[in-house]
């Protein structure tokens, strides 16, 4: 059975396409796992202790949060990687850019989640400000955690350029 050049090229092209799709799936899974694990924990602390939400409201917020983290995790990873290109190797620069990425992307989403879950007035303001402060401090730890999870999945840490642009 002889293969034509076109058939061989088509097979190689399909193989490369399948590998890119598999890598994108792995990137999506790694970023989603990292976001859900890290921010479910920190969200509970903020909602209960700072926003003063009831346990029922916290549960509702975490369920909504988990559902929203699935479609948001990979776009956030791409956003973070894009912003981290601006950071230089110094700790201060890494801290600044990781924190800026997290606050600018996640705080508006978080405010909507807790508002929809029942936080109003002062509780909504305190919860949103609390989340913003937490994210300022957690930006770099989350960035390091995200890089660690990506490494566990066999992916590069990101930050040089968005992983989705590697292929």
UniProtKB/Swiss-Prot annotation:
Membrane-crossing segments per the record: 25-45, 50-70, 105-125, 129-149
Which is a Pfam family this sequence falls into?
A: AlaE
One GO BP annotation of this record: amino acid export across plasma membrane
One function term, GO molecular function aspect: L-amino acid efflux transmembrane transporter activity
Q: What does the UniProt keyword field contain?
A: Amino-acid transport, Cell inner membrane, Cell membrane, Membrane, Plasmid, Transmembrane, Transmembrane helix, Transport
For membrane topology, the record states:
Multi-pass membrane protein
User: Can you supply one Gene Ontology CC term for this chain's record?
Assistant: plasma membrane
List locations, semicolon-separated.
Cell inner membrane
Q: Which domain of life is it from?
A: Bacteria
Q: What does this protein do?
A: Exports L-alanine.
The UniProt similarity line reads:
Belongs to the AlaE exporter family.
Designated name of the protein: L-alanine exporter AlaE
Organism this protein belongs to: Pantoea sp. (strain At-9b)
């Amino acid at each position: 059975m002889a293969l034509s050049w076109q058939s061989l090229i088509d097979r190689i092209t399909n193989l490369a396409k399948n590998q890119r799709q598999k890598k994108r799936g792995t990137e999506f899974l790694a970023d989603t796992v990292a976001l859900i694990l890290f921010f479910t924990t920190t969200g509970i602390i903020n909602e209960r202790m700072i926003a003063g939400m009831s346990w029922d409201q916290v549960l509702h917020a975490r369920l909504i949060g988990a559902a929203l983290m699935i479609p948001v995790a990979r776009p956030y990873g791409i956003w973070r990687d894009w912003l981290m290109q601006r950071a230089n190797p110094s700790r201060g620069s890494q801290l600044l850019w990781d924190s800026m990425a997290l606050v600018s992307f996640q705080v508006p989403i978080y405010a909507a989640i807790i508002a929809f879950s029942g936080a109003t007035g002062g509780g909504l303001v305190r919860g949103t400000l609390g989340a913003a402060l937490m994210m300022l401090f957690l930006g770099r730890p989350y960035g390091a955690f995200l890089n660690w999870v990506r490494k566990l999945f066999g992916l590069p840490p990101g930050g040089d350029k968005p992983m989705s642009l590697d292929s």
